[in-house]
A protein has these predicted regions:
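Catalytic domains of cell-wall/extracellular-matrix polysaccharide-remodeling enzymes
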Residues: 133-208, 466-468
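Acidic-and-aromatic substrate-binding clefts and catalytic sites of carbohydrate-active enzymes
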Residues: 43-51, 71-83, 104-107, 160-169, ...
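Metal-dependent polysaccharide deacetylase catalytic core of the NodB/CE4 family, i.e.
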Residues: 74-163, 221-253, 281-295, 405, ...
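Acidic-aromatic substrate-binding/catalytic surfaces of carbohydrate-active enzymes
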Residues: 369-448, 456
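Acidic, contiguous internal or C-terminal segments within carbohydrate-active enzymes
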Residues: 446-492
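Beta-strand-rich recognition/accessory modules
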Residues: 19, 261-265, 287-290, 500-544
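Active-site beta->alpha N-cap acidic-glycine motif
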Residues: 21-91, 284-286
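Catalytic grooves of carbohydrate-active enzymes
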Residues: 36, 52, 56, 146, ...
């Protein structure tokens, strides 16, 4: 393993010298395939089809000389066919890890009673660790880890899941030394799982009491980076499904083709990989390719067979850095004591409709800046606080769905409707100011500066780890920031004073504070912020 990691570092050194980004900002790609042995929704021949899918994925990676991460659900791990496949045919340097969905054979091996309808039941209260007590979670971890070591000779270093609770993740790290985890992208309601407002891409150190929430301190964090999965379109994924109970999907998944975009559309794949390889990312960028075998080979084949050679080509060109999930986890821990600031910058959109999107994340907040032509708004701002304990940390979830959220200041999805696009806009004389010719500039390791032109002067937006700055220093007219939402939106805001606004999200109190500027309540919007000396500065750190 030391030799493998040394090789990775050498590749990083070569790759980082070749692309336009800063030398300390590698663009990692993980090919992660997670493996189930059973899928009750498929019908006859299900087990054979699932196995055939995984075998074909592995063969294609071998053909193009790529290493992958294969994460095994318990039922697949104890199946001799998968054991032989991965022991004999898996390419050197690839990785076998754990996929943390809970199945009937896993539960029964732990001496617990299975409560599901099927041997694998995807509902939150039986199919995920959140549906079990803390003591049950420990037993489930112990049984899996010992069986894995019995089969493969070591404990897994990577554990993935659509979502995983902090108690389980912390226990895995302390007792078994896992080095990396991965969790589903942000989504609202898809499959009954809501993960909303989190660190948008790349990776973060999670809170000890909430695995979805980035931690702010070393004492408050689990020292295992959580990587966000599936490769969301930074322009179109967010708004997909506004006005409905569930988001659509525009991701790198090889089966995806929502609205003519996604991982089965060659042009979109090329656009996405190019954007992630060349756009400004600050500390590093991260792409997860691959697919769960439940979608079956015939459905994913076309997209998978296009993506793998495209990825191989970009690795050969030095634009992407190939790594397993655990290698990324070790690199992250070697380079960051705390969650770094990262960004995803889409300077155009696949449909060529003059849309742009910038995602910025730090350990304190995330923000999305969005353009539709020159029309600009902050589409999303969510704050992070490691003290917000998950509903599932110390008690089992009892519902078939689940919910993980953070602390919203702006939510352009939940507070919008088909008629109203919610957002925080720059306004002058009651009209939204367009921001033309935006330029994105990196300042140091953690700051993005966005410059552009408005009718009242040049605007400068600065995204720092602990604050957001909006300034038009030599304005030719009055301006302000205004939050507009759909009138029916459920908002978290409470008492407002000139320098602070109180808020509450599912019973957790937080505040929004201004370093410069002042809050004003107004009848034509939810609230406004008036600048001071040409600037508005939000403090994004939740006070202790």
């Amino acid at each position: 393993m030391k030799k493998t990691f040394a090789t990775l570092m050498a590749v990083l050194a070569c790759a980082c010298a070749m692309y336009a980004g800063p030398k300390d900002a590698p663009r990692f790609i993980n090919i992660v395939n997670f493996v189930r042995q059973t899928e009750p929704r498929i019908g006859d021949g299900m087990e054979e089809e699932l196995y055939r899918c995984t075998a074909n994925q592995l063969s294609l990676l071998n053909k193009y000389g790529l290493k992958g991460t294969f994460l095994l659900q318990y039922d697949a791990m104890i199946d001799p066919r998968y054991q032989y496949l991965l022991k004999v045919r898996l390419r050197e340097g690839s990785e076998i890890g754990a996929w943390w969905e809970i199945t009937q054979p896993h539960v029964e091996a732990a001496g617990l009673q299975w409560r599901g309808v099927y041997p694998w039941d995807w509902h939150a209260n039986v199919g995920f660790s959140t549906g079990y007590s803390q003591e049950e979670r420990k037993v489930l971890v112990d049984v899996y880890m010992e069986k894995f070591r019995e089969i493969f000779g070591y404990y897994p270093k990577s554990v993935g899941s659509w979502y995983i609770d902090a108690f389980t993740l912390d226990y895995m790290q302390r007792e078994y030394g896992i080095e990396a985890s991965c969790m589903c992208r942000d989504q609202y309601g898809t499959d009954g799982y809501t993960l909303w407002g989190g660190y948008w891409n790349q990776a973060y150190y999670p809170s000890k009491v909430n695995a979805f929430m980035p931690a702010q301190t070393e004492d408050g964090q689990i020292p295992v980076p959580v990587f966000r999965m599936l490769g969301s379109d930074p322009v179109y994924q967010y708004d997909n499904g506004i006005g409905s109970q569930m988001q659509g999907v525009v991701t790198l998944e090889p089966v995806g083709a929502g609205n003519g975009m996604g991982g089965s559309v060659p042009g979109w794949v090329d656009w996405y990989l190019d954007m992630m390889a060349k756009g400004e990312c600050l500390a590093f960028n991260y792409i997860q390719a691959g697919q769960e075998n439940s979608f079956m080979w015939d459905r994913m084949r076309e997209g998978y067979e296009y993506q793998i050679p495209a990825i191989r080509k970009m690795i050969d060109e030095g634009l992407l850095v190939e790594a397993t999930l655990s290698e990324c986890g070790r690199w992250f821990r070697d380079n960051f004591k705390l969650t770094p600031a990262t960004s995803v910058v889409a300077g155009d959109d696949f449909l060529k409709s003059a849309k742009r999107s910038i995602w910025y994340d730090s350990r304190f907040y995330r923000a999305n800046l969005f353009w539709d032509g020159a029309d600009f708004r902050f589409r999303d701002i969510h704050f992070f606080d490691e003290r917000k304990k998950s509903d599932y940390y110390d008690r089992a979830g009892t519902t078939t769905d689940c919910r993980f959220t953070t602390l919203p200041l702006v939510d352009g999805y939940l507070w919008s409707s088909k008629d109203v696009s919610a957002g925080l806009r720059v306004v002058s004389e009651g009209k939204t100011l367009a921001i033309a010719d935006p330029k994105v500039i990196r300042r140091g390791k953690s700051t993005l500066v966005i410059k552009g032109r408005t009718l009242v002067g040049r605007i400068r937006i600065v995204l720092k780890e602990d604050r957001i700055v909006v300034g038009i220093p030599f304005s030719k007219g009055k301006w302000e920031l205004a939050l507009n939402t759909d009138p029916a939106a459920s908002l978290p805001f409470g008492a407002v004073s000139p320098k602070a606004m109180e808020a509450s999200e599912y019973g957790f109190a937080y505040s929004v504070r201004l370093i410069k500027g002042s809050f004003v309540q107004s009848g034509d919007c939810v609230w406004k912020v008036l600048p001071s000396c040409g600037r508005v500065v939000f403090d994004t750190v939740q006070k202790r």
